[in-house]
Amino acid sequence: MERPNLPKELPEDIEDKKEAAQGWFQSLRDALCAEFEQLEDELAGPLSDQTPGRFVAKDWQRENGEGGGGRMSMMEGRVFEKVGIHTSTVYGEFSPDFRSQIPGAEEDPRFWASGLSLIAHPVNPNVPTVHMNTRMVVTTSQWFGGGCDLTPMLNRRRTQEDTDSVLFHRAMQIVCDRHKVADYQRYKAWCDEYFYLKHRNESRGIGGIFFDWLHSTEEAGGWDADFAFTRDVGRAFSMVYPRIVRSNFNETWTEEDRDEQLIRRGRYVEFNLLYDRGTIFGLKTGGNVESILSSLPPVVRWP
């Protein structure tokens, strides 16, 4: 999607808005960690004789304690082979070669960004991998961005008619339809366009929503409306994905299913390293490399 021309002005209470956004991302992180640990506890099918996983949190700082930092929460368990739920709040200056890619950064290279990112790689091939992130960015402009997308591991489940796909898309449509500043059809198409592996001519998953540069006019509700939608995206995800996990995580699987899962994970690696905007942003702004690359699956296979 073409990048819009965002207003080059910040509200007088921008610091209060930053604090509110940062606080929300941190509270959502804590709620999601609790929910994912609950899923670990509930498993009753294969591997239920193993110990449920628990998150291990690790705080980090940029540039010798300057420029902000974040918290990296990782879990390896019997439901999730690897799941990371991370928050960060960073600030500084964009490098000269990166400024032209960020709205408002060419006039002034200083930036502030806060957000949450989640990626889950389940053990059971019947349970789809998922990615979700929401963020607020401030330069000489300010905006929200984010999205959720679902990646089934098994080809027989990679259809728009699959129960998981229908449920996930419906949840995303409902949350968009509740907010005048959101546009479900546009965000759905944007997701399909964004999460596409051009070199393989295939989609990463079955889609979801993706949005960026969300800066609504005061007539449309302004920052408050954008923030309300961003919060609701997190809430919608926290309801729909655990439901999908619970409907699949007690199913059995075969060695062929596992092989298919590992090959599909390889596509995930390819996308994140070649195309993902968040990965590039994090590496370009001195983010925590361990946290940025934690989105990669733990075990992968290329045929």
From Swiss-Prot:
Site (Important for dimerization): 199
Similarity comment: family membership: Belongs to the aerobic coproporphyrinogen-III oxidase family.
Subunit comment: Homodimer.
Pathway: Porphyrin-containing compound metabolism; protoporphyrin-IX biosynthesis; protoporphyrinogen-IX from coproporphyrinogen-III (O2 route): step 1/1
Keywords: Cytoplasm, Heme biosynthesis, Metal-binding, Oxidoreductase, Porphyrin biosynthesis
Annotated GO biological process: protoporphyrinogen IX biosynthetic process
Pfam families xrefs: Coprogen_oxidas
Keyword Manganese appears in the UniProt entry: no
Enzyme class (EC, first level): oxidoreductase
Reactions that this protein is recorded to catalyse: coproporphyrinogen III + O2 + 2 H(+) = protoporphyrinogen IX + 2 CO2 + 2 H2O
Compartments, as annotated in UniProt: Cytoplasm
Cofactor(s) the protein requires to work: a divalent metal cation
Residues at which substrate binds: 117, 133-135, 286-288
Region feature (Important for dimerization): 268-303
Matching HAMAP family: Coprogen_oxidas
Protein name, per record: Oxygen-dependent coproporphyrinogen-III oxidase
Binding-site positions, a divalent metal cation: 121, 131, 169, 199
EC number: 1.3.3.3
GO cellular component: cytoplasm
Molecular function, one GO term: protein homodimerization activity
Organism: Rhizobium rhizogenes (strain K84 / ATCC BAA-868) (Agrobacterium radiobacter)
Its job: Involved in the heme biosynthesis. Catalyzes the aerobic oxidative decarboxylation of propionate groups of rings A and B of coproporphyrinogen-III to yield the vinyl groups in protoporphyrinogen-IX.
Catalytic residues of the enzyme: 131 (proton donor)
PANTHER family: COPROPORPHYRINOGEN III OXIDASE, MITOCHONDRIAL, OXYGEN-DEPENDENT COPROPORPHYRINOGEN-III OXIDASE, MITOCHONDRIAL
